[in-house]
């Protein structure tokens, strides 16, 4: 194996915009990483996840094709 090809790991502090901080190891030399989201404030981990209908895609689909009722036949071959 080649010597001196692997980067050195440093103690690194991760600062989140929510105010949470934690320490990990990283190859980042200055020892500080600023993150926008972390496990303390990310909606998936906090249970506050929302499903967004961006741009009204469902409504647009229903306008184009209409809303079908269960058991209603869709137009077929002639």
From Swiss-Prot:
The keyword Zinc belongs to this UniProt entry's keyword annotation: yes
Pfam families tied to this protein: Ribosomal_L31 (PF01197)
Residues that, per the record, bind Zn(2+): 16, 18, 38, 41
One term under GO cellular component: ribosome
Gene Ontology biological-process annotations: translation
UniProt entry keywords in alphabetical sequence: Metal-binding, Ribonucleoprotein, Ribosomal protein, RNA-binding, rRNA-binding, Zinc
Needed co-factor(s): Zn(2+)
GO MF term (any one): rRNA binding
InterPro entries: Ribosomal_bL28/bL31-like_sf, Ribosomal_bL31, Ribosomal_bL31_A, Ribosomal_bL31_sf
PROSITE patterns per UniProt: RIBOSOMAL_L31 (PS01143)
Cofactor binding note of this UniProt entry: Binds 1 zinc ion per subunit.
Top-level taxon: Bacteria
Subunit structure: Part of the 50S ribosomal subunit.
Alphabetized PANTHER family for the sequence: 50S RIBOSOMAL PROTEIN L31, CHLOROPLASTIC, LARGE RIBOSOMAL SUBUNIT PROTEIN BL31C
UniProt-listed NCBIfam families: L31, PRK00019.1, PRK00528.1
Family membership: Belongs to the bacterial ribosomal protein bL31 family. Type A subfamily.
Record's function text: Binds the 23S rRNA.
The name this protein goes by in its record: Large ribosomal subunit protein bL31
Organism: Frankia alni (strain DSM 45986 / CECT 9034 / ACN14a)
Record gene name: rpmE
């Amino acid at each position: 194996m080649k010597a001196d090809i692997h980067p050195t790991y440093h103690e690194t502090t991760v600062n989140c915009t929510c105010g949470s901080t934690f320490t990990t190891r990283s190859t980042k030399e200055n020892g500080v990483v600023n993150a926008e989201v972390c496990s303390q404030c990310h909606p998936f981990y906090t249970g506050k996840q929302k499903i967004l209908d961006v741009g009204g895609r469902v409504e647009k689909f229903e306008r184009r094709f209409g809303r079908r009722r269960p058991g209603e036949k869709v137009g077929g071959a002639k």
